Amino acid sequence: IYSLPFKENYFDLILCNHVLEHIEDDNKALNELHRVIKNKGILIAQIPLDKNLKKTFENKEIINRRDRNKYFGQYDHVRIYGLDFYKRLSNSGFKPKKVDFLKKISTKEKIKYCLPKDEEIPVGIAIK
């Protein structure tokens, strides 16, 4: 994800579904996604977002599975995103938007598909 084999301005849409919380340098990855997306292209960046955190929690010294599970909620995560994720999108050249798709889904569907009650999906519109 740091060096994708595509030319600049290649994609109209990129779906990055639960990837960024697993990689060491998410800013480098976002910059690379911006490179390969067209102007006004859409990046859907689904991540675990804790709306109670103003700032993303990450600590490079937390390296073993037990501690990562304890602090990040999963052994292979390297951070928990806070509300500053939208600023990270902006810093990489995207115009950030929040999409609350759950308002459009019935309670029955939320239960059927085990969806969280208040998930927000960050979307970035590429600005070039």
Where are these regions (language model features)?
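A short acidic, Gly/Pro-enriched loop at the edge of an enzyme's catalytic core
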Residues: 2-14
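A short SAM/SAH-binding and catalytic strip from SAM-dependent methyltransferases
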Residues: 12-24
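S-adenosyl-L-methionine-dependent methyltransferase catalytic module, highlighting the catalytic core
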Residues: 24-38, 42-127
